[in-house]
């Protein structure tokens, strides 16, 4: 599969506990998000990175890698979900925000080597470690070092295409938002096929770890800008 490092909009490391409870407001529209970036509450990190994400609590600990994948990994989502009124409204809201609010959860066939690589990344200091009201702890490590990025990319390149493991309505809304933005770009004659909205940020979890239900990265913790605002 194709899964690449990406530039991220995320909470400032020292203000994450302030930012996460305010995400409904911060991500209410692009103006509010711009204000949070100006204020220093949110950080627009321009350098591409992979992120290792771990959540622990009941029923255990799950580790995944966060990357951007071509948005067509979301095609073939539940047709009923794709055509629902709620999905269409959510797609319009995401297209207007111009930011994907949280990674979509996908399952993939991980290799033992990938487990070792991600385990090594987790030996460093974490970027975030926060516990939510449900008692689940979310940890994130940023992977920017060239050799580590290359190792993760090589493993993901060898993996089969991932499968959806998220709410079908959310996955369909992301695909719908990408389509709306692509239609807009085609209308004005600027579409190239390389725009950020042609990619979706995904939390990739080993299939074996999510058979009983896949976790979700908290909204706003790792977001992906899909169009200029």
Sequence positions of predicted segments:
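Surface-exposed, charge/polar-rich loops and edge strands
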Residues: 1-162, 167-229
């Amino acid at each position: 599969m194709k899964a690449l490092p990406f530039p991220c909009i995320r909470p400032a490391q020292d203000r994450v506990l302030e930012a996460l409870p305010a995400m409904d407001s911060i991500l209410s529209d692009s103006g509010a998000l711009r204000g949070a970036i100006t204020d220093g509450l949110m950080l627009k990190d321009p350098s591409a990175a992979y992120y290792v994400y771990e959540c622990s609590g009941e029923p255990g600990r799950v580790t995944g890698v966060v990357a951007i994948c071509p948005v067509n990994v979301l095609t073939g989502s539940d047709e009923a979900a794709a055509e629902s009124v709620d999905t269409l409204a959510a797609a319009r809201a995401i297209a207007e925000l111009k930011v994907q609010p949280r990674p979509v959860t996908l399952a993939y066939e991980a290799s033992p080597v990938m487990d070792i690589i991600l385990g090594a990344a987790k030996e460093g200091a974490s970027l975030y470690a926060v516990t939510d009201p449900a008692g689940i702890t979310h940890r994130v490590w940023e992977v920017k070092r060239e050799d580590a990025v290359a190792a993760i990319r090589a493993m993901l390149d060898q993996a089969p295409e991932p499968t959806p493991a998220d709410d079908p309505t959310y996955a369909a809304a992301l695909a719908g938002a990408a389509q709306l933005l692509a239609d807009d770009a085609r209308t004005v004659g600027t579409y190239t096929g390389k725009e950020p909205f042609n990619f979706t940020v995904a939390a990739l979890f080993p299939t074996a770890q999510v058979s009983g239900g896949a976790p979700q990265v908290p909204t706003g913790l790792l977001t992906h800008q899909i169009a200029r605002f």
